[in-house]
């Protein structure tokens, strides 16, 4: 068995399986790796290898996730699959496994079920941009009309949550039969892989996005000015470019007059690098940790937003008691805590440890944010929850 060399030339795309318990997500994951390995080369992963997923800690939260990889001729995929419903909720909210697209698995024998709906809603809230449907267990349904009905229901459900239900690719297959090597069902897995290639666009790389650096520290260097340090989250900053300082106070413009890394001077700082950026005409006291340095106009400060949050269970080191409306924790964005108040949905009086919930947050100071930004909820420095900005309000 020759070891394949890792092809860096292929675009890398992150996907995952979502859907109701026992509809066949893990079987499908195994079938994809098996059929694609057989067709295009690569490694197959057996069902039981995927099913006993290792525990991971993301921001102090315990999540069971399996990671598999597979290739089509044009792309390399990293695929996540979770054994339990709670794991999906935590995974999607924390962004532990970011998905460029998801495969929604719906058993044709059952049709859409409560978790089908919940995973679609979560996908909408946390910004999963594309969903492809795999109708599973179609070998067990003889009635063509029933298949039509299930497909219609799934498309309606997607449309309800603002996904393009009418245009979403739907593949009718059987993960188990494909795994057992039956050619007509293997062909359905190849069809699914074709949709992964064609329907999910190549994700924009961090380096191609507008420049943003969360400020971790501020120094003044006599005779040179003020330096901010941090890790460039996205984009590139070049010496001589205009930048904005956003968040906590009024937005201020400045010019980058130097970039340094490990005491060496550079022409630019790129996504992923820890750099110091020298700013023209800015006083040390004008700027603080928690603000961001960004390409002018690319990000705005906000105080009010709709969010999807997961509250840690007692076992995860979270609260031991529920909280109620009027709860005022700190919200930790990038590098700093900001106090905020919450509004719970209509009819929800309290939130228990281990729950996930939609809530509106009002911060006492503005933070540079876009939809999809992750945050932690803290009480006196201890993490009690994780969340994602679903929609900026003001």
UniProtKB/Swiss-Prot annotation:
Q: Where is this region: G4?
A: 136-139
Primary subcellular site in the record, as a coarse category: cytoplasm
Q: What reaction gets catalysed by this protein?
A: GTP + H2O = GDP + phosphate + H(+)
Q: Which UniProt keywords apply?
A: Cytoplasm, Elongation factor, GTP-binding, Hydrolase, Magnesium, Metal-binding, Nucleotide-binding, Protein biosynthesis
Q: Which family does it belong to?
A: Belongs to the TRAFAC class translation factor GTPase superfamily. Classic translation factor GTPase family. EF-Tu/EF-1A subfamily.
> What assembly does the database describe for this protein?
Monomer.
What is the name of this protein?
A: Elongation factor Tu 1
């Amino acid at each position: 068995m020759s070891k394949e060399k890792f092809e860096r030339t292929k675009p890398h795309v992150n996907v995952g399986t979502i859907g109701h318990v026992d509809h066949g997500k893990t079987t499908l994951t195994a079938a994809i790796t098996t059929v694609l390995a057989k067709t295009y080369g690569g490694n197959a992963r057996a069902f039981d290898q995927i099913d006993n997923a290792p525990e991971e800690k993301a921001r102090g939260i315990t999540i069971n996730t399996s990671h598999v990889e597979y290739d089509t001729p044009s792309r390399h995929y990293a695929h996540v699959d979770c054994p339990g419903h709670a794991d999906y909720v935590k995974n999607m909210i924390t962004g532990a496994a970011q998905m460029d697209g998801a495969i929604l698995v719906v058993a044709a024998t059952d049709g859409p079920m409560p978790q089908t709906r919940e995973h679609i809603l979560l996908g909408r809230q946390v910004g999963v941009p594309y969903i492809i449907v795999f109708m599973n267990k179609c070998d067990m349904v003889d009635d063509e009309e029933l298949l039509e009905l299930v497909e219609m229901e799934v498309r309606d459900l997607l449309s309800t949550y603002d996904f393009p239900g009418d245009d979403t690719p739907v593949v009718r297959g059987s993960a188990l039969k494909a795994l057992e090597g039956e050619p007509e069902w293997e062909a359905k897995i190849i069809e699914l892989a074709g949709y992964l290639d064609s329907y999910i666009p190549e994700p924009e790389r961090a380096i191609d996005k507008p420049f943003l650096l969360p400020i971790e520290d501020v120094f003044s260097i006599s005779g040179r000015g003020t330096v901010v340090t941090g890790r460039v989250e996205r984009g590139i900053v070049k010496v001589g470019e205009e930048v904005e300082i956003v968040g906590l106070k009024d937005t201020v413009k400045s010019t980058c007059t130097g970039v340094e890394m490990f005491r060496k001077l550079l022409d630019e700082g790129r996504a992923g690098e820890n750099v110091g950026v020298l700013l023209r005409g800015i006083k040390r006291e004008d700027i603080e940790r928690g603000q961001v340095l960004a390409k002018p106009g690319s990000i705005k400060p906000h105080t009010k937003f709709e969010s999807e949050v997961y509250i840690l269970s007692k076992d995860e080191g979270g609260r031991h008691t529920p909280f109620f409306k009027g709860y005022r924790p700190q919200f930790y964005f990038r590098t700093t805590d900001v106090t905020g108040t919450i509004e719970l949905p209509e009819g929800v009086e309290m939130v228990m440890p281990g729950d996930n919930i939609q809530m509106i947050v009002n911060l006492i100071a503005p933070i540079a944010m876009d939809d999809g930004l992750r945050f932690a909820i803290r009480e006196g420095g201890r993490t009690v929850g994780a969340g994602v900005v679903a929609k900026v309000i003001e």
